[in-house]
Amino acid sequence: MLFLKKNKTRQHTKVNWKIKHNCLDLIIESAKSIYPNEFGALLRVDDQQKSIISEIILLPGTVQGETHTIFKLHMMPIDFNIVGTIHSHPSPFPIPSDADLELFRKHGRVHIIIANPYNHSSWKAYDYNGEEIKIEIV
């Protein structure tokens, strides 16, 4: 019997992502509090409105250093409302590294990078291909 490897291609579906203001504030304060280390967490959407990011989930065992955040993804809860990741950069550039892009491709549909000085204008969002996307604050 011959088994062929299934070609993993994602269908690009347009989602108008939104993030709750208080969730973004929590991300900002979390990034500030752990500086100069990187902050990292998972993004979770509302149960009823699947395009609104409403909270973050801290993974047990996450390693946060000055140049990296290592997620222990085997500790991720079984939760279909987890849609991506958030992590901070101690530099002023919210641009994904090669390691970030690898994570984006493997886990989640939307990802946020917040950069120093950690405020409402120092973050960017990306899809799983590393393409910048817009997220509305609600």
Descriptions of predicted regions:
Residues 1-82, 91-138:
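Conserved beta-strand-loop surface patch within small alpha/beta domains used
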